UniProtKB/Swiss-Prot annotation:
Gene3D superfamilies: 1.20.960.30, YVTN repeat-like/Quinoprotein amine dehydrogenase. This is Nuclear distribution protein PAC1. InterPro entries: Dynein_regulator_LIS1, G-protein_beta_WD-40_rep, LIS1_N, WD40/YVTN_repeat-like_dom_sf, WD40_repeat_CS, WD40_repeat_dom_sf, WD40_rpt, WD_LIS1/nudF_dynein_reg. WD repeats lie at residues 119-158, 164-205, 206-246, 249-291, 328-368, 389-428, 437-486. Keywords: Cell cycle, Cell division, Coiled coil, Cytoplasm, Cytoskeleton, Microtubule, Mitosis, Repeat, Transport, WD repeat. It is found in: Cytoplasm, Cytoskeleton; Cytoplasm, Cytoskeleton, Spindle pole. Belongs to the WD repeat LIS1/nudF family. It comes from Candida dubliniensis (strain CD36 / ATCC MYA-646 / CBS 7987 / NCPF 3949 / NRRL Y-17841) (Yeast). GO terms for cellular component: cytoplasm; microtubule; microtubule associated complex; spindle pole. Transmembrane segments: none annotated. Pfam families: WD40.
Length: 489
């Protein structure tokens, strides 16, 4: 019985030619008779001549074989990805705290297995996902800037490596609007600006000590903010290359900052320091508007909480437990000034191993004048909750795009995901996921920025959540003192 072939007649002919082509250079002079015999078996009588029907390609069999291997690897990768996605769908996404997470994309958190890992020669000090492209950037303590392409099969070789600074790179940030300029700051006292193709275009000098952190204005690509060990907060025009303003915000080393923009009142700067405090300042005037005091050690990082979900959850929690907050006027929670400002709550992380959540008193807003310190609580912020779970310094924070989850990285080598909504159920912000994968301190984390906004402007929270879900990029990275960057699945 004749065996059925899975190949077409043309494919069979191409395969036969490829076999002869592969064997020809391997055969010695005295083996040519054997090769002739094999050619007849394969119905290739003139294997040394070009065929009119079959296109002859050099090293055809080897190329086909390597293609099969690549496809097999790709299939395995896709099967693993499907398995991980199925696990996410089938899992209830619950922890020992009994908090059940939604299976919707809006509440996506990584399962805890690294999809890819990138290894550097030195300690990774900072990481950042590109706002638009599939690129991971990281800075190291030797001053090198690495750029990795997520879509590359080979994750051992960076897309690009730049000797950006002479000492450690402490922070990387991108502009919020196209074109996406990049800024890096360093312990060499400088800030460097890079274009979209990562060409160096300008160096900003002015700080007298380590530049700890930087961030662009959300509404103006030309404006960059920086904080330093020299205690100064500086405002830069990156195109002119000049410092527009400098003011002292703290009595000791300024560690980190976060920026929020208001349509009518410009930018507001939230900073933290070795003096164990955080401070809200008005960028244009440099005026201090509110203080955050309550940590027992260096405050490493600060973040504004977005209004999406967080405001509603925290307002409800305070209202239901107002007896715990006797100095917070209930009418303050409904103060419309917050709508003008673009901020209400913030979080801080410290070397005292805790994360604290704060209600910021609103500054006084007057027409044609810069904002003034708040009339409430002597301009002191109210601590709403304390997040305990890390066993060592909490070094980095980021906020999930949905505004509900807080993500923290610590010197205890763990990354934790905290659910604000658990406040309403248990009275505390509980951990819903702990990721363990690094062998060293977690120095930085980053959740991918949302895709570019559409022209529509959602108004209700439900519509806002749908818009965020549509624009979400489910990518999360971490950088560690173990010299690695991990992209989490």
């Amino acid at each position: 019985m004749e065996k059925l072939s899975i190949l077409t007649e043309r494919q069979q002919t191409e395969l036969n030619y490829a076999i002869i082509q592969y064997l020809q250079p391997l055969c010695q002079q005295d083996n040519h008779a054997l090769l002739d015999q094999l050619s007849k078996i394969l119905n290739i009588d003139q294997w040394t001549q070009e065929s009119n029907n079959v296109e002859k390609v050099d090293n055809y069999l080897e190329k086909r074989w390597s293609t099969v291997l690549r496809l097999q690897k790709k299939i395995i990768d896709l099967e693993n990805e499907i398995s991980n996605l199925n696990n996410i769908i089938n899992s209830s996404n619950s922890d020992n705290n009994g908090i059940v997470l939604s299976k919707d994309k809006i509440n996506w958190i990584p399962k805890g297995t690294a999809k890819q890992s990138y290894q550097c020669e030195n300690i990774v000090t900072t990481v950042k996902l590109h706002p638009n492209l599939p690129l991971v950037l990281n800075g190291c303590n030797d001053g090198n800037l690495y750029i990795w392409n997520i879509s590359n099969d080979d994750n051992t070789i960076p897309e690009k490596m730049i000797k950006a600074h002479t000492r450690a790179i402490n922070k990387i940030c991108f502009t919020y609007k196209k074109p996406y300029y990049l800024a890096t700051c360093s312990s060499d006292l400088t800030i460097k600006i890079w274009d979209e193709k990562f060409n160096h275009i300008r160096t900003l000098n002015g700080h007298e000590h380590t530049v700890s952190s930087i961030q662009f204005s959300p509404i103006d690509n030309s404006i960059l903010y920086s904080v330093s060990r020299d205690k100064n907060i500086r405002v830069w025009d990156i195109f002119q290359g000049i410092s527009l303003k400098s003011f002292v915000g703290h009595s000791e080393w300024c560690r980190d900052l976060d920026i929020v923009s208001s349509d009518n009142n410009g930018d507001f700067v939230l900073t933290c320091s070795n003096d164990q405090s955080a401070r809200l300042s008005h960028a244009s005037s440099g005026a201090g508007l509110a203080m955050i005091v309550g940590h027992g050690h260096v405050v490493e990082t600060v973040k504004f909480l977005p209004a999406l979900q967080a405001n509603k959850i925290l307002d409800e929690y305070i209202t239901k437990n107002i007896e715990q907050f006797p100095t917070i006027p209930l009418e303050l929670l409904k103060d419309k000034t917050y709508n003008q400002l673009g901020f209400k709550y913030c979080i801080t992380a410290s070397r005292d191993n805790t994360i604290k959540l704060w209600l910021i008193p609103p500054p006084k807003i007057a027409p044609h004048r810069p904002p003034l310190p708040s009339k409430y609580n002597n301009s002191q912020s109210w601590m709403i909750a304390e997040l305990r779970g890390h066993s060592s310094w909490v070094k980095c924070l980021c906020v999930h795009p949905n505004g509900r989850f807080i993500i923290s990285g610590s010197d205890d080598k763990t990354i934790k995901f905290w659910d604000l909504s658990s406040l309403l159920e248990t009275g505390s912000v509980n951990v819903v996921k702990t990721i363990i994968g690094h062998d060293g301190f977690i120095n930085d984390i980053d959740f991918a920025r949302l895709k570019e906004a559409s022209d529509s402007t959602p108004t209700s929270q439900e519509d806002l959540l749908k818009e965020v879900e549509k624009r979400m990029r489910c990518l999360f990275i971490s950088g560690s003192a173990d010299n690695s960057i991990k992209l989490w699945n």
